[in-house]
């Protein structure tokens, strides 16, 4: 059985990392000639119970474990050999671009254009969907792709068209306002959505977010810091949507672990120095400083930290996994939570080989959503809440994930340390979730 360069996420976190995992999921891709196969085993367990701006998206995906062997699909409660769906022709004509020839129709809503011009992000996500169809999902689903024109009205119109053509599940859109509009159409039709927004406020029962959410990053880094003996914190955050959500999540995460937050210093553009002085005044009372800032602003923030003499342990989120941050002298030794990059690197290699271009970071979201739809489509209760919120979750190269009943998700992230201008894993991503 040949092994391929993609592998799933790292070993389970130890109890010292403050997390315990069980109910191991198993999703595998394999190669047989030009065809990729998937095996998804959801181990026996009880069924489980802001897009901040169009420029500040946190992408992520699950580019999956590979193994060269024949495979099938096993789901809890599935009847082996049960017919997946009536013939596609029973639903009438498809809409938009159509990929695959499976009996189950799935709609995909992407921002293929914006202000009348082609969208590179949308094009990359569409290409990734094609990869998924060709590698696995095309035999179980027919994928209908519509352009929402990066607008709420376009998203609603796309949803109506795809549902009218027999779609049982909608994938996308990307931007929060567009998700809200499309979700209202899907909810009225009683069909679920798996959307790509990073705005957790658009999630709801039946509208699931596949993206990496700020809550996931914050929970992971706080839990890790506490497990390493950090008992009190300070926060230095920008006055923007990302900062607002991150600060709120940090308070919740720290509160659950009885870790006091001594000060929260907010700052506007170019005003990091004043916030750093606030933190510096209490630096002797805190063990770590959390800074949820984007990579392009971190050089000025780092300079403010240096001038204020702040040397406490720095904590961040996945937006720090950027060369502009990794090379900053003041950030050496900092910790941040992020998906392991091995999965995206392997996906990128294959994407480049096929399309001769670099994928957008969000491309793995559409790729994984299509593959997940293809796997679930082979079972009688394919897109039910029970199937989508299975407590065991799904396992991929970027880490395990599962959908919560409220539409948000839980993902397994690694913790990185910045050392010698590079990010090194100091706490591997978990391979599985605790049951419950």
Predicted regions and their residues:
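Beta-alpha junction/loop-to-helix N-cap segments that form part of ligand/metal-binding clefts
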Residues: 123-124, 135, 139-201
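Periplasmic-binding protein-like
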Residues: 162-174, 194-196, 234-237, 285-298, ...
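Bacterial signal peptide processing site
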Residues: 70-73
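Short beta-strand elements at the ligand-binding edges of bilobed clamshell
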Residues: 192-194, 201-223, 237, 264, ...
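Segments of small-molecule ligand-sensing domains
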Residues: 355-425, 436
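An alpha-beta-alpha
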Residues: 209-266
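Extracellular/periplasmic periplasmic-binding protein-like sensory domains
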Residues: 298-367, 380
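N-terminal secretory signal peptides
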Residues: 1-68
């Amino acid at each position: 059985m040949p092994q391929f360069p993609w592998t799933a996420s790292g070993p389970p976190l130890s109890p010292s990392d403050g997390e315990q995992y069980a109910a191991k999921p198993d999703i595998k891709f394999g190669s047989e000639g030009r065809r990729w196969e998937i095996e998804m085993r959801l181990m026996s367990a009880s069924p489980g119970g802001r897009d901040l701006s169009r420029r500040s998206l946190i992408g992520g995906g699950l580019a999956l474990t590979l193994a060269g062997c024949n495979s099938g699909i096993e789901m809890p409660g599935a009847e082996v050999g049960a017919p997946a769906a009536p013939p596609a022709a029973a639903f009438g004509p498809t809409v938009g671009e159509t990929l695959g020839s499976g009996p189950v129709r799935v709609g995909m809503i992407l921002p293929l254009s914006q202000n009348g011009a082609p969208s590179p992000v949308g094009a990359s996500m569409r290409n990734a969907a094609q990869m998924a169809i060709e590698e696995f999902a095309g035999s179980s689903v027919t994928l209908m792709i519509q352009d929402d024109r990066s607008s709420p009205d376009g998203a609603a119109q796309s949803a109506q068209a795809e549902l009218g053509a027999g779609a049982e599940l909608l994938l996308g859109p990307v931007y929060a306002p567009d998700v809200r509009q499309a979700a209202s159409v899907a909810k009225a039709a009683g069909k679920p959505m798996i959307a790509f927004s990073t705005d957790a406020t658009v999630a709801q029962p039946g509208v699931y977010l596949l993206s990496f959410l700020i809550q996931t990053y914050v929970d992971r880094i706080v839990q890790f810091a506490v497990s390493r003996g950090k008992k009190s914190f300070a926060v230095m955050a920008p006055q923007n949507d990302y900062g607002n959500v991150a600060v709120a999540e940090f308070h919740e995460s720290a509160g659950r672990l009885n870790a006091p937050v001594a000060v929260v210093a907010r700052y506007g553009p170019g005003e990091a120095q004043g916030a750093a002085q606030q933190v510096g005044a209490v630096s002797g009372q805190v063990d770590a400083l959390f800074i949820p800032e984007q990579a392009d602003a971190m050089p000025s923030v780092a300079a403010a930290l240096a001038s204020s003499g702040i040397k406490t342990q720095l904590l961040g989120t996945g937006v720090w996994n950027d060369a502009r941050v990794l090379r900053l002298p003041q950030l050496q030794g900092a910790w941040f939570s992020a998906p392991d990059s091995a999965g995206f690197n392997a996906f990128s290699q294959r994407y480049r080989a096929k399309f001769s271009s670099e994928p957008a970071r969000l491309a793995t979201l559409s790729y994984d959503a299509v593959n997940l739809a293809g796997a679930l489509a082979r079972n009688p209760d394919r897109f039910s809440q029970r199937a989508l919120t299975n407590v065991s979750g799904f396992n991929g190269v970027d880490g395990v994930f599962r959908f919560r009943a409220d539409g948000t998700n839980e993902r397994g992230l690694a913790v990185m340390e910045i050392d010698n201008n590079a990010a090194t894993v100091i706490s591997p991503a978990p391979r599985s979730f605790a049951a419950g």
